[in-house]
Amino acid sequence: MRKIAIYGKGGIGKSTTTQNTVAGLAEMGKKVMVVGCDPKADSTRLLLGGLTQKTVLDTLREEGEDVELEDIIKEGYGASRCTESGGPEPGVGCAGRGIITSVNMLEQLGAYDDEWGLDYVFYDVLGDVVCGGFAMPIRDGKAEEIYIVVSGEMMAMYAANNICKGILKYADAGGVRLGGLICNSRKVDNEMEMIQELARQLGTQMIHFVPRDNMVQRAEINRKTVIDFDPAHQQADEYRALAKKIDDNEMFVIPKPLEIEELEKLLIDFGIAN
């Protein structure tokens, strides 16, 4: 079973990219579980056809310790298994702590057991890993491969670099490695070349360039992944290609984070600062 965490700047399209990629893997016959690690609890919506799922923390709050696995895991597109850790009430408690509670709960209830025949577990993780709780999949060896969703925008690249610092910090203890950057295009000038160069300097690869297409939004409005909504569309093939590249990937590295000056030089070299 491969354990993968998807990180990236808030709003970059992690949940969308994760769910569309999972749909691609499911179509290939892979058995996948998705663990949403975001208080917004939107990491599985498209796989479940828009069904709002009761989160692990909500279930715990309402039912106490008496929780069954089927209370917190729902079956989604292509027999994917979907669960959301959820978060504390706004303004109370720590969302990162909630993720730790949820993942421990899933382990205790046997969500990762061999009987499910899982090929993949995906953790879709909030934001920029500035807080220890959100770093938990990296820190405690829950995830072994990290993919960072990035674009050619300054803050997305800055966040990706920060995440690499987190991976570097825990690489020895948790055995976690960076599998590559996924460029979720924002149609920035020279975007593909810039992210390829960023990947090179970090010592990794740009595993796939996902072009910007309104079909993604159209599918989302219909509460589906692109592969589910319009399987013949070119954008569906992009996600299939990404799924295949992740399935075939053998490049796992400890990244070499850039200094802020190097990052700014990269932006200037590719003309974004002009």
UniProtKB/Swiss-Prot annotation:
Entry comment on modification after translation: The reversible ADP-ribosylation of Arg-97 inactivates the nitrogenase reductase and regulates nitrogenase activity.
Name used for this protein in its record: Nitrogenase iron protein
GO annotation, biological process: nitrogen fixation
Cofactor note: Binds 1 [4Fe-4S] cluster per dimer.
Cofactor: [4Fe-4S] cluster
Modified residues (ADP-ribosylarginine): 97
Quaternary context: Homodimer.
Amino-acid positions noted as binding [4Fe-4S] cluster in the UniProt annotation, renumbered to this chain: 94, 131
GO molecular function, one term: metal ion binding
InterPro entries assigned to the protein according to its UniProt record, in alphabetical order: NifH/chlL_CS, NifH/frxC, Nitrogenase_Fe_NifH, P-loop_NTPase
Protein family membership: Belongs to the NifH/BchL/ChlL family.
Function, as annotated: The key enzymatic reactions in nitrogen fixation are catalyzed by the nitrogenase complex, which has 2 components: the iron protein and the molybdenum-iron protein.
Gene: nifH
Alphabetized Pfam families for the sequence: Fer4_NifH
E.C. number(s) listed in UniProt: 1.18.6.1
Keyword entries, A-Z: 4Fe-4S, ADP-ribosylation, ATP-binding, Iron, Iron-sulfur, Metal-binding, Nitrogen fixation, Nucleotide-binding, Oxidoreductase
Catalysis performed (reactions): N2 + 8 reduced [2Fe-2S]-[ferredoxin] + 16 ATP + 16 H2O = H2 + 8 oxidized [2Fe-2S]-[ferredoxin] + 2 NH4(+) + 16 ADP + 16 phosphate + 6 H(+)
List of residues binding ATP: 8-15
